[in-house]
Amino acid sequence: MSLRPCLTPSSMQYSDIYIHTTPHPHTPHHTHHTHTTPTPTPHPHTHTPTPERSLSLRLRQAKPDQPVSQITLHYPTSPLVTLTHSTIPPQPPSISLCTTTNRPSTITVTLQLPISNSTTTYPTISHLLLTILLFYPPLLKR
């Protein structure tokens, strides 16, 4: 079973990006504004304390006259996941990934930007901002 891209093979472009990130230290959100409430109201959705890692990358396309059709992103120390995006995102897409216990060395994120017919033209994508949020389960030892 293979996915048929909407772009013709001659106009397909692939971009492989290898990213190495370091986890940011957790900064508290509410630093300036101390509210003292008599009775604290618990939230219905309790957040499990999972460390977050987010990365942002800008992609330059190979040819300036054609939009990038597919992007493969390799993220180290993360589970292997392939995601597709069917349309050109009007804003940077946010992708949430859940990790597993055994972690492969790379994660592959595939962004597919199809052109449905030859008359459809997209503005040139000079930069595509992709934000990936990685949620890690609590590590036993590190």
UniProtKB/Swiss-Prot annotation:
Residue ranges, compositional bias (Basic residues): 26-35
Region Disordered, residue ranges: 19-54
Protein name: Putative uncharacterized protein YDR544C
The organism of origin for this protein: Saccharomyces cerevisiae (strain ATCC 204508 / S288c)
